[in-house]
Amino acid sequence: FKINDNESSFFKNWDFNLSPFQQWSIRALLENKNALVTAHTGSGKTIPAEAAIIHFTNKNKRVIYTSPIKALTNQKFNDFSKKFTNISFGILTGDNKYNPEADVLLMTAEILRNTLFQKNILKQGNICNNELLSFDFDFENDLGCIIMDEAHFINDFERGRIWEETILLTPSKIPLLLLSATLSRPEELAKFIENRGGPEVYLCSTVKRMVPLYHNGYITIPDSYIKQFNDDERKKYLKRKMRGRRSYQVEKDW
């Protein structure tokens, strides 16, 4: 990965060395390409989102950030507002509507999908009734990027169509930044995005978990059962119950 002067200057927004997947995702943003980030938990997927906010607001473009749940939307709104005090942020959830004219709008995935769907209907019918929309601006000219957090929800049986329809309804020239820690077969989603037209997709992944993952189990049984076993038998019993688990811990003294 050879860093050019533009990228080197942009990377200085952070006071630490960026990992390869972060560098590639930022390169995609700087080149107005799509980026699909599939990185392990704790590896720093927020950095590409921050890069999108910095880059596109500096170009006087607006940014939309979506998540599948209100709690995450509220959390990111608070985090970004505290970190980027020179950028205006707004939030749209079923319970809250604040500053819809902001530089960066954070919302649930359904609100973006519904807005895109309504805008498409209004456009086809030559109807102009902005009161039907949760928010409104010129996507083609004013929107710089859409960030879709927890993008693995596209595989959800009940809600996955929300992400599919959002991708299909978004003007193809608008870059998408999708973030996930658990997305299976990301190359298929990348192909799906590219098939709608527009820029190519940079698939930015990690190969090693930065935060170790441990599996532990704990079993409780009635005291009357415990009294029937000696120490060795207890351990064998628990081992049978915990078979198939990655790790287990047996207390010596009960």
Range-by-range predicted roles:
Residues 1-38:
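Conserved pre-motif I regulatory segment
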Residues 27-34, 45-59, 79, 164-170:
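Walker A/P-loop NTP-binding motif
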Residues 31-37, 61-62, 102-103, 174-175:
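Pre-Walker A (Motif I) flank of P-loop NTPase domains
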Residues 41:
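The conserved Walker
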Residues 61-114, 191:
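Conserved nucleic-acid-binding Ia/Ib motif block in the N-terminal RecA-like helicase ATPase lobe
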Residues 72, 98, 150-154, 185:
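Residues immediately C-terminal
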Residues 109-111, 119-177:
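SF2 helicase catalytic motif II
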Residues 168, 175-177, 182-194, 198-254:
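Conserved interdomain linker/interface between the two RecA-like ATPase lobes of SF2 helicase motors
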